Amino acid sequence: MLMIFLGITITLFFTDVILVLAGCRKNIYSLTKYAKPFLCPLILAGYILALTPLLPDSRNIMLMLSISLACSTAGSILADYIKKRICILAGAAAFTAAGACFLVLLHPSFYLCPIPVWLYALTAAGLAAADIFTILHFFRKEDIILSVITAACFTVLYAFLGAAVVTAAGSFRLYSLLLLAGAVLLLPQSFWTAERFTRSDKKNKQFETTLLFALSELLVCAGFCCMILL
């Protein structure tokens, strides 16, 4: 079981690195386009595949996973076809989060989560806040409502899905491995954002947004590490 989990995690890590490097060669829009629509379902798939033998009603969980992956892929393709950058982010987030909601409903124990899981939710909220400020910073005022919806979807995806999965793990060892894997998966994007921040001009419009984005992602990583220590 541990070897299967490590194999999935390592695969996701290198996939993350490749996608982030591809985004570095373009710009922030390219990173959003190529990385996030694929990373959400990939991380979701890795977690569920690793935990399926430990969870009740595994058939239902795999069914919900399939729905989530299908919806996320359809949303990404549709958004790319529309050629509107905001839709690429919102579509992938909304459809993936919709599948995540089904998974959360299968685990009502989320509402009895320990303090570390709620700490996860708080750090995830910081990342969602960075998403909404990034969108508001780069797009027109008429996209504000869609921006709020997108940030809400990311909050559901990162906080509720992650909390439900780690709660269902049951084993402290596996729980710690999941949190560590999540921190590792976030590091490449955090490093890329921090590196972009150092190159930004203080007079540049992107400066404040990039700083907030980098700090929020590093906060998520720090949250993972704190939960492991707890």
Name every feature range the model reports, one short phrase each.
Residues M1-L230:
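Polytopic alpha-helical membrane-helix bundles and their juxtamembrane interface segments
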